[in-house]
Structure formats: C-alpha cells, structure tokens
Amino acid sequence: DRRPNFVMHCGDVVDNGPAKREWVSELFGPCRDLFARSAVFPTIGNHEKNHAWYYKYFSLPAPEYYYSYRYGNAEYFVVDSNKSLKPDSEQYKWLDKALAASTATWKFCYHHHPCWSSDNNDYGDTAKGIRKAGDLNAR
C-alpha cells in the first residue's frame, strides 16, 4: 500500500468557495480515498474566498489561516498570502517567532501566490514583501 505521509496543498482547492457543491462533489468526491488515508495541510487560496466551508472541512491548528506542523526533521510553515505579510502584520510576526523557535533541520514555508512571477502582476507585491523580509528566507 503506497500512500503519501501527508498532502500539502497550495490553495484553490475549489474554484468558488461559497459553492458547497464544489467542496462535496469536486474536491471530496475525487479525493475521498486519499484524504481518508493521509493528513491534509492546505493553505487557503483566493478562490476559497475565506469562506466558512474551508474552516469547517479542514481541521487545522489555530488560527487556521496560518499555522505550522512538523514531520520528521522538517517543519512546515503555512501562511495566507491573501492577507498581509508585511513586517508589521500578525502573520509576519508569528512567522518570525516560529522560525526563531524552530529546532527542525529543514524548514519550509508555503503559500498560495507565487513568490515571483514572469508578468507584471506579482499578486500584491509578494516579491517585494519577500525582499523586505530579509533573513526570514534564510532561517
């Protein structure tokens, strides 16, 4: 029986967050067996629209839109790139403290929007925010 130890999903698990049909039929229908056997650690995308179904169907560590978890000698940090990641934001402060406290050999951070984009729309200046973050990237 080959199965993943866990599933990381970078958001947009559905196309229209308020549409319950999409959660039930288009996500959980096809993924039922996989999700039943493996832990699922998503990050929220823009298509979920911060809808209550996301928080109802996924049981995530508080505050749910950003969190961390460990697997082996790795720690994973999940942030919501739909919300502010500026140095004075709640998420940034949490990530800064969490990275400093982490004893994991490997540290991974994931989110929905790309860090860099090949076009002029870099999704809310994500790349500029990352450049300002400085050593958060190197911890």
Locate predicted features.
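Active-site metal-binding loops of divalent metal-dependent hydrolases
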Residues: 1, 11-13, 46-47, 81-82, ...
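N-terminal active-site segment of His-dependent metallophosphoesterases
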Residues: 1-21, 117-118
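Receiver (REC) domain switch-region micro-motif
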Residues: 7, 107-109
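Extended active-site neighborhood of metal-dependent phosphoesterases/phosphodiesterases
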Residues: 21-107, 121-139
